[in-house]
Amino acid sequence: EILIGLVGSEMCIRDSTAAVFVSFDKKPTKEQMLEAWANFRGPAQELDLPSAPKQFLHYFEENDRPQPKLDRNTEHGMAVCIGRLREDTLFDYKFACMSHNTLRGAAGGAVLLAELLAAKGYFD
C-alpha cells in the first residue's frame, strides 16, 4: 500500500507543478526510488511510440530543480521532471515534479494516447 499526498498548481507559464508526499508499507531507500524512476518504462516506451519520450521520468540532482522555465522542454516537453527528493517528517518522502501543460498535459498527451490506442488495436 502506498499513501500519497499531493499539492498541485498550474502556472501562467504553461506548466504544472506538484509537491508530492508519499509513504509506503515498506519504506524504500532514496537510492531505490531514484533507481525506480530511472528505470521506469511505461507502455508508451515499451511500444516505442512516435510521441513518447525515451525517458519519461527525469530526476534532477540540483536543489533548485525542476524549474518550469529551464525544464519544460525536456524530452520535447513530454517528460515529467522530478527533483528535491528528501525524507519528510509526516510521510516517508517528499519531492517536486513538473510537466509542460500543453505538450504533456493536453495536445501532446492526446496524441500519445491516440498512438497507444492504435498500437493496442482499438481502431482496428
Where does each model-flagged region fall?
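C-terminal helical cap and adjacent loop that interface with cofactors, partners, or active-site loops
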Residues: 24-25, 41-45, 54, 61-124
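Metallocofactor- and cofactor-centric catalytic cores in central/energy metabolism, strongly enriched
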Residues: 3, 33, 68
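Acidic Ser/Thr/Pro-rich low-complexity disordered segments
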Residues: 49-50
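Residues that form or flank phosphate/diphosphate-binding pockets in enzymes
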Residues: 1, 28, 105
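Histidine- and/or cysteine-centered catalytic micro-motif in compact active-site loops
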Residues: 9, 23-27
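Single conserved hydrophobic/aromatic residue that forms the stacking wall/gate
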Residues: 1-8, 12
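Conserved glycine-rich beta-strand-loop-beta hairpin in the small C-terminal domain of fold type I
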Residues: 14-19
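Short amphipathic alpha-helices in soluble, non-transmembrane regions
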Residues: 30-41
